[in-house]
Amino acid sequence: MREIVHVQGGQCGNQIGAKFWEVISDEHGIDPTGTYCGDSDLQLERINVFYNEATGGRFVPRAILMDLEPGTMDSVRAGPFGQLFRPDNFVFGQTGAGNNWAKGHYTEGAELIDSVLDVVRKEAEGCDCLQGFQITHSLGGGTGSGMGTLLISKVREEYPDRIMETFSVFPSPKVSDTVVEPYNATLSVHQLVENADEVQVIDNEALYDICFRTLKLTTPTYGDLNHLVSAAMSGVTCCLRFPGQLNSDLRKLAVNLVPFPRLHFFLIGFAPLTSRGSQQYRALSVPELTQQMFDAKNMMCASDPRHGRYLTASAMFRGRMSTKEVDEQMLNVQNKNSSYFVEWIPNNMKSSVCDIPPKGLKMSVTFVGNSTAIQEMFKRVSDQFTAMFRRKAFLHWYTGEGMDEMEFTEAESNMNDLVSEYQQYQDATAEEEGEFDEEEGEMGAEEGA
């Protein structure tokens, strides 16, 4: 019931995804061979959200792994939980996308996409009542960004009424893996704005900061970063997988967090932050969790929520706690920091409580916020994009794959529109209602024309 089909694409997506399955399997008591060895019935009660039960009582993830080169797949297969996945669900090419969005979206990726869609259909048909899809990918490379967005648009066509949730790793401000990241990211955002329902924005620099500052790790690896991401991913879906006093699911999340259809890019945070080795020895209280969760240092993307205002936010608590206390703390945060919440959406915090905490913690909270501060991130990518595009640098790699410069211009203006939409709602007050309606009317007329 309420199944989620998970797709991971490209190197980044596959590495985050592999980590995610380690975390989820641990929570449900599934060992690397797919056998259940847990100690509580609750682990099995709704295990079919993420797993199929195969013959012999083995549990197989509803996961599809795709990439345009075999390298990452091989390392996932050789990894600790590599034997867990269904072998048919590894779909890969041989050529690689070479960090080129056009290769992932139009040429190499387009050749492979049909075999991916076949596997997606097969997984979707095995579901009782499909809730939606979750996709892990990065926006800086070629496969995760180009082929990832191609898959999203194809799945969108075929399953228009299912929720499409992505965990997208954006290029970081200071750490860059690829020179053409701004191009790839802008072209991807152009697609995500139209075809995704909720995008959880992650970036490596913020994750590094968390590792250095909060976890005091001297040399964080990608494994540590991905561990943080998967903690948040597991928190977003915990209400589907375990019983709770106040449930939420992907659709409720979307309904509560997306006030305007294009503004569905979320900041995510997690508390309490612990490094992989040292589990915390003291249990945090609900007020401490709430305080840590709203802390800018806890956000997994390099946008400071204090530079904008929250349109909406959602907190998913896990563990044994009183819902009354949760509600009080949420109100408390809103009252004390009312300037950081838009006043024209009253009660814009949603909370849910799930009784089962993650492994090794007494209680935890996952935070998902829709803040106008995220425009900083888009602005930054957009500036880098414009700097290169003005000189048409690196463009031949994209036009050589059959892309048109027009598409770049469109993606650029779509990104800039997104930034100004966020800005418009950040500046809006409750009094200006009338002016808004007129503007909306004019905009509507233009769109109609």
Curated annotation (Swiss-Prot):
Q: Where is the composition biased (Acidic residues)?
A: 429-449
Q: Which SUPFAM superfamilies match?
A: Tubulin C-terminal domain-like (SSF55307), Tubulin nucleotide-binding domain-like (SSF52490)
Any idea where this protein resides?
Answer: Cytoplasm, Cytoskeleton
Which BP terms from GO are recorded? microtubule-based process
Span list, region Disordered = 426-449
> Pfam families from the xrefs?
Tubulin (PF00091), Tubulin_C (PF03953)
What is one cellular component GO term in this UniProt entry? cytoplasm
- Keyword NADP in the entry? The reply is no
Signal sequence range: none
Q: State the Gene Ontology terms under molecular function.
A: GTP binding; GTPase activity; metal ion binding; structural constituent of cytoskeleton
Q: Which residues bind GTP?
A: 11, 69, 138, 142-144, 204, 226
**Where is it chiefly localized?**
cytoplasm
Name-wise, this protein is Tubulin beta chain
